[in-house]
Structures are given as C-alpha cells and as structure tokens.
Amino acid sequence: MRTLQRVLLLAGAAWLVAACGGNGGGDEAAPAPAPPSPSPCDTPGTTYARFTKAAVLSAGVGGGAAIAGCTGAIASPQWTQTGGPAVELLSAKSQTLHFEALTGGRYSFRADFRDTTGAARSEDFVIDFAPLGLGTRLALRANHSVRMGGNVSVRAWPTLAGGDSVATITWAQLEGPAVTLDTRDPNVALFVAPQVARDTPIRLRATLTTAAGHSASDEVLVLVERHAQAAANDSGALWAGDHVSRVHAYRPNGPHAAVLAACVYDSAQRDNNLCRLSQLPFLAQEVGTGVPTVEQVMNRVVVSHDWAGRNFEAFLNTHDVQGDFRRMLKSVAAIVIGTHVRPSFYYAGTGAIYLDADNFWLTPEERDTVNEAPDFRSSFGQTLQYTTLWRYVQGTQSIFRFYDPRQRVTRGNVALLEEAGWLMFHELGHALDFLPPSVYGTLQDANTAWGSIAPRANGGQLASHTVPSLYPLTSSVMSGLGQVRFFGAAASATQNAYSPQQVAAFFAADLATDDYAYATPFEDVAMTLEEFLMARRLNYRRDFAVAARPGPGATGSTITVAWGQRGRIGEPALRPRLRAIVQQLAPWIDPAEVDQLAAPIAMRAGDSWTGNLSLPAPLPGPRLHKTEPTLEDLWQLERAERRRHRLQPWSKPLPRQATGTPAAAVR
C-alpha cells in the first residue's frame, strides 16, 4: 500500500467558471469555451482528484462536485452537507454531487470515500451562490456519475419572463473525450459514456435564446467512471455484454447489506463464484410459512439512489394491504431498483428482480436522476402494418397519467401503485414461475440461487413448461410475429402484408391475453398472472387492442381500433389455463376467484383508442377526433405501445454451474 497520497484541486478556468451571467444568472451571451486544463491525475502519485462545476454560481441552477479515481476505483462515496441553507442530496452515495440552491449563500459539503488503495479519505467543498435573479435563466439537470458505456441524459430547464418563449436551445461539449450528442429534442441531450483510462469528467453547456432576444446558459458535470464491464464474448461472466451500474444496499446496516450488491448486481460475477444461499438466502428461507414483513423485504433492496428504496417501502406500506406483493417476494433473493435499469427484468441466475426506477419517482428532483435514454429495441417491428395497444383502466379512465417531462411535476402516492403495481406482478410472476411456493421447503443453504432453480428449469417442470403443454398457444403466425416485435427478427414479406384485421383474427382465436405472450412461454405465464391479479386484487381491468401502425402525429384520439377487448382474462376459454397458473404460482388465492372474473367487453371497431375508454356505451359526439394533438394525447398513445420495451425479453446464458450447459433466460 502506498504511504504517500496526493490530491489536487483543479483550479483551471475550464472548471472554475465565474457567474457573469454564464451559468443561468442573467441574459448575457454564453462565454466562450475555456482552453483545456491539465488533469490533476497527471501528477505522479495522485490517487484521486476533485472537481467542481464552478466556484461561484447563481441561485436557481444546480451546484455540483465530484471525486474521481486516478489510479483505480473510488469506493463507498458519501456526501454530507456541512454548512449553508439546507438542500436535499438525492445522489449522496454517488461520486458526483448535485444539489439545488434556491437562495444565495455559501454551501459546504464533505465527501467521505475510500480511495484506490482502500484508504479512508475525506474532502471538503465550498460553493458560493449569488442571489436568485429575476431575469431569464437556464438550469441543466443533473450533475451525475455514470460508468463508461452507460446511457446519459441531461435536460435543460428554462425560466422565462412573462410572455416570452423559447426560440432555441443549443448544446456544446466543453471538456472531456468527444461524445456524439443526440439533441433531436433540444430540451434533452443524450449520449453514451465513452471508454476512459481513468475517471474522467465531461462538461456540457446549453445556451438558451428566447423570442424576445434574451439568452442564458448553464453547464453540467458528468463524471465517467472507469469501470470495466464483462465482455460480451466472456461465456463465464454472469453479466456478459450487459451494462451494470453502481448500486448499494438501501439499508446499510441490514443483515445482508455486506453481500447484496456483490451477489446480485456486480459485473465481476461469474458462473463459478455465485453466492450460496448461506450467504444470501431467498426471502422464503428467512420467513418460513408466514408473510414477510416490510422490514424483511427492505433488507433485500438494492438501489442506485436511496429515494428509490424509500418510495418502494412506501409502496409496500400503502398498497400491499392483502400481502400479495410480499408473498410473491418470497421467491426472490433481492430487489434491485436503478435509474439505469431499463428494461425491467427477472434473472434466475441471481434469483433477483431488477426494476426501472422511472416507475417509482414522486418528486421532480427524483425524476431528474432517472435516465431518459430510450431502449434501442423500441424500433422492432416498424415494417409491420399493425401495432398492439394496452392500458389498465378503472371505470372509464386509464390509470396511466401524463406527467409532462417539461414541467416540475409532483406525483401522489397512488402513482406508485399505478406505475409499479402491474410491473411488480409481472416480474414476480417470473420469480414464482422459476421458484414456486411448493419448492420452498427443498431449498438448501449449500446451493446457489440458480443451482436451486436449474433442475426444475432444465427438467421442464416450470409452470411455463407445463401450462403451455396442457393449454398451448396454437397460432404459428402470432408466434412468428412475436419474434419480429420482441426480438428484432426481420419481418418477411408475408408478415409485412398482414392487415390489422387479419392479425386481430389470429389473436382472438387463441388463448393469449396479450401478444407479448408470444415472445416466450415465460412471458405467456407472467402476462396471464399479471392481468388476473390486477383485476382481482386491485380492481384494474386491462384493455388490449390491435390497430393500424400509427403514422407521424397520430394520437390515441386519431388511431382506429381494429379489434380489442377489456378484461380478456375473463374469457371462458382462458380460464382452465389461468386456474392452473394460479394454483401453481399463487396458492394462497382461492382458485374459485378465476370463475368470478367479469366477462370481457368488446371494443368498438372503428372507434378511436381514446373513444374506447368508455365501454360499453360510447361517449356522445364524433368518435374520431381530428383536432390538434395535445402532449397528453401523444404520450397516451406512446405509453400504449411502450410496455414491451420496458419488459423486453432477452435471451442470455444462465450460469452453467448446476448443469454444465447454458440455458435461456427471460429477462
């Protein structure tokens, strides 16, 4: 271990930018980019470096600072405010600090961490803010850290004088390895963090020009962490080809805190060093035959940001009245919630579920930390003539509400149920499929999570094996289309020629509740259980429809439904397979509830997706609305198509430890 450690404060003009109106404090033009400064890491013997967004800022924009590793990784970062008006630190366990200063003054912070040698270190930061001005300003949110190869999003937030409007927002990179900025939406800059030799800052500037001729700018600090991910061709790596982001145990003093992240979300995991259940047991082993307490569940939660764990705990305390979610969670070893987890998935290799934090934010500040980069798989199936739509409704209203990304929106606690309830039922349906209650008593501490699952999975004993065998989906056409829509297979000329009406006929005659069931048998079972539980436990009914592929500018009010149903899960032909799924995966529920499901309601072919919210009676007035689309109309249609991109199945090798051969995993 080295005895001499050196740290330098980067004091060059490239990082210590004076206010002078250039950081959101007024209407002055943006200052010219400063010449690059030498990195403090270039000094021999330096193991870490510190960066600040600027020495002086104006209130109303975000302050930022970072600790970077020069010769290796920084571990266990923790930011604490030590002076100034109180601010919320939502990324306190990240290498990069972001905070919102609403008033002028001096703000001070301490960063505690372990440097690249493992030595405990502490650094103090002081950032001054001038008083909040009344002029035009621009704030970039948020300063943050990302591992190389990760998606990055930064959003620009203009504040304008009354009657003024945005003319342009332009972006420029000021420092760091060159990246390609996607600014097709000028309010957001997207890029992929580049490969770096050491932790490296990237600095962007956005400049606002208004219709009245005013201007303002702000800068943002993004620290790219040097963290090697597992190579895609590394057959022994558990996360080969995947991006694994930084996470930590939500409860640092919990009984499993020391091993949680290492056992379920670490790029270094390999199939020959999986954690044994003696290190991290399934929740069922800890609970026995009872229902887990919220505290027992929270001891298994791993997060990128503590707010995600806090809101997940509120979700359980408020919305798990009947204990279904906690009972289902007995089949997992951990719950990972991350701002870079997209899409959500379950992984039998670790026995954990992985949830997109976008489902759990409540405040605009929490939302600022959630990555906005879309999943590349959203382009699948673009040559087909049809699309499928879905939503959950209560009465005649969709439970999915529009939260304008350009507004500082706060969501109520009920949003946690609306946004995350269906997701939890779906991913936990997968967990129960691979580890049903009937096998809890066979779990052995000496085994691994995958070692406990593999014999049944490879032996064809899962519900996703037995139920489709007894009650199969029979449409080969829909199965083929499922490969196009959910795995990116190229569509054939025949597939591209199918009309929405033809696809609707293929689907309606079969036993699936959603065309996502044709992705894999695992999704078939999870979709069926999800819709049943949403209907019987939460009183939300599911709409599913087939429609023509929407063109540019289409909305829920203009797209025409070719065929659809509300509550397809109540279709009599589906009940035998549903009953078998419930009996195997949710035995605490009386299977007689399957027969108590309401009969499905047919949608009105030829009416719009929005018009079909009112069933069975149509709303008065014209059925198809040709008015100028609103943002909400556009969003509701996007949401109706988007679910598949949040739950995209993705085959990847499972650990070979138990059987010696890989098996396909549904994520």
Regions found by a protein language model. Name each.
Residues 119-129, 214-228:
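C-terminal edge beta-strand
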Residues 309-484:
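Acidic/His-rich structured neighborhood in mature extracellular/periplasmic domains
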Residues 105-109, 200-204:
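Exposed beta-strand face motif in extracellular beta-rich ectodomains
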Residues 487-667:
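Pan-zinc metallopeptidase signature
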Residues 62-74, 155-163:
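Acidic, Ser/Thr
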Residues 80-98, 173-192:
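Surface-exposed, flexible coil segments in extracellular/virion-facing regions
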Residues 17-51, 124-126:
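Bacterial Sec-dependent N-terminal signal peptides
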